[in-house]
């Protein structure tokens, strides 16, 4: 949260060069960006849109739009793969642990994003 707050405050500090939207690499950074915008007197999403990535449970509280990357499912699949490897007598499985797994993502639109206002 703190890193997102500091970075957003720096980006939004000069209104002449301020962006219309911020993409954050994690929801926690997004929470900080929303707070920084509010502390600078900006309205989210009227003045600045904020979107992040994770699908953190607190995202709903903050109204943060997010790209939910199914982290719980990813962790469960990783644990299952590890158990399979540890319990296997198959030398091929033990020697070839690289595996490509794709996950669906969900765009969760909440109140932190809006279309850019027209001038």
Whereabouts are the PLM-identified features?
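Flexible loop/turn connectors
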Residues: 9, 13-118
């Amino acid at each position: 949260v703190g890193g997102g707050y500091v970075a957003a405050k720096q980006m939004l500090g000069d209104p002449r060069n301020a962006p219309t939207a911020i993409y954050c690499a994690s929801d926690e950074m997004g929470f900080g960006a929303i707070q920084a915008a509010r502390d600078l007197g900006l309205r989210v999403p009227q003045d600045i849109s904020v979107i992040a990535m994770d699908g953190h449970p607190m995202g709903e509280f903050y109204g943060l739009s997010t790209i939910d990357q199914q982290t719980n499912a990813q962790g469960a699949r990783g644990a299952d793969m590890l158990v399979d490897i540890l319990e296997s007598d198959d030398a091929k499985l033990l020697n070839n642990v690289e595996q490509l797994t794709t996950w669906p993502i969900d765009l969760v639109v909440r109140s932190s994003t809006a279309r850019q206002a027209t001038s």
